Amino acid sequence: MNSFWLRLRERLINFYPPLLGAGIRSRTIDDLTIHVEMKLTALNRNIVGVHFGGSLYAMCDPWFMLIMMRALGPDYIVWDKAARIKFVSPGHGTVKAVFQIPQERVNEIRAVADRGEKIEPTFSVDVWGEQGQVIAHVEKLLYVRKK
């Protein structure tokens, strides 16, 4: 899949119902970085008036996989395999996260996959509140191999 179609898919993902309903918006900065934010609304507020944990997780779900798919190209299989979220403090207002994979890490993963091996890299991201406090820490485990 060429770059145009990947970028179009990334723009259209903002209209995917679970993301749209939670008010999650993404913005691609470059090939290896995506900024995501979510405003607190009646649709993503929990019973105590802060961000619902499921929405915080949904905010972090697809991005590392999408970055890795774009970085490696169509000759590789990339799947989300597992995730873990640790809630650190209540989220009020708009929360944000920056998903980034360094080019050196992409090169390391590609080298392992090119040897015919599967690789299961782990990535982490913090979700930040408006005052700069950490709201949640998320770890994602991917599965990567050459087709």
Name each model-derived stretch.
Residues 102-147:
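HotDog/MaoC-like acyl-thioester-processing domains
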